[in-house]
Amino acid sequence: MPNGRSHFLPESDPGESAKATRGAGVVRARASTPSKGDTRARIIEAAREAFSTMGFEGASLRSVAKEAGVQHQLATYYFKTKEELWMAVMDELAIGFFARLGERIRGLEGVDAPTKLRLVVREFVKYSAEYPQLHRLMTMEGRRESERLAWLIKRHVSRFYSISTKLIREAQATGVVRPGDPGQLHYCAIGIATSAFSLAPEYKLVTGNDPFARSHIEQIADLVCDFLFARPEKDHQRRNK
């Protein structure tokens, strides 16, 4: 990061040099002050942890501001209410996922449905490992009906459900994916994909394994695919008669 000081100050009178030094100090001070984007990002990052560990009721704007290292008044400048901050957190997590998902799907144009489903599953598992807070937050909000849950469903959840079940139905049509209600398969697959990450402290203490190890993430993705692509034995036998 530039420190604002010129490497070659002119050899002028002491007064001019002093002015230049004071000016450089001002520039350095400004350079060390976080930009608006950085400040907002720090607040959202702190809020993401707070909401995903303490829940909406347990977190507060004041505690989030303290964790982010900013004044409470500055936090309220960016987010007038706790609800507004919570929505910003959910938007950032969901929009980030949809951006990754969209890029992946666009890159799979012309690919067969089963392969597309497998690769999208792996993208979802990878994102869930990078941002375990997403499923923790979804689990907290999904426990009871509320305005926040209704907002989430309308704004993000329904969209993902539609994409996911469409991919499942298309892959089922080829005969290589487990038969059954796509909605049930969707939610069961999410459970397999996210549990080790969202319950990471418990999982690590019980199993002794690091859920965020690259090899483990790959294994989880394999498990989700094995679940979706496995067919009941009777169905398999019937199809091969």
Spans of model-derived segments:
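C-terminal peripheral helix-coil segments that are non-catalytic and often amphipathic
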Residues: 1-27, 119-126, 130, 158-174, ...
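Helix-turn-helix
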Residues: 42, 50-84, 88
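Amphipathic, non-transmembrane alpha-helical scaffold segments
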Residues: 44, 90, 94, 117, ...
